[in-house]
Amino acid sequence: MKDWPIVEAVPGAQEALTALHADWTLALATNADDSAEEDIWAALRRVGLDQELDKVYCYTNIGYKKPSPKFFQHILADLHLTPDQVVMIGDSYENDVLGANRSGLRAIWFNWQTSEIRETVRHRTIHELGELPGILKELK
């Protein structure tokens, strides 16, 4: 990841993460298996997002991938949090949203590719990262 020729932040990421970091512990949880944690931190530094995140979790440092409950259980244990204290935000409906829901976490589906909305009591949908602070304020 750190050696990719192009690393770009999603539009609105800096603003959303800066707004959220004051009230939330922010962690990146990725299925990337081509990069170690240090590589991911290096990529985050390239786009200026490293200061907004507290932790990085990936396949190489957990040994599991989403949607495995073991992936989410590892993160909860490491952060000393319960499922009701965590909201998973991700762009994969199956891995991020349903995986989190099956592990007792609430989730937000970041569907930046279509206008589709899927919502239940356990998850919401956003299409732009600028929507995050408002939704998370409602959920807190």
Which residues are covered by each model-predicted region?
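Surface-exposed cleft-lining segments at the edges of enzyme active sites
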Residues: 1-6
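Asp-based, Mg2+/Mn2+-dependent phosphohydrolase catalytic module
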Residues: 9-14, 18-19, 27-140
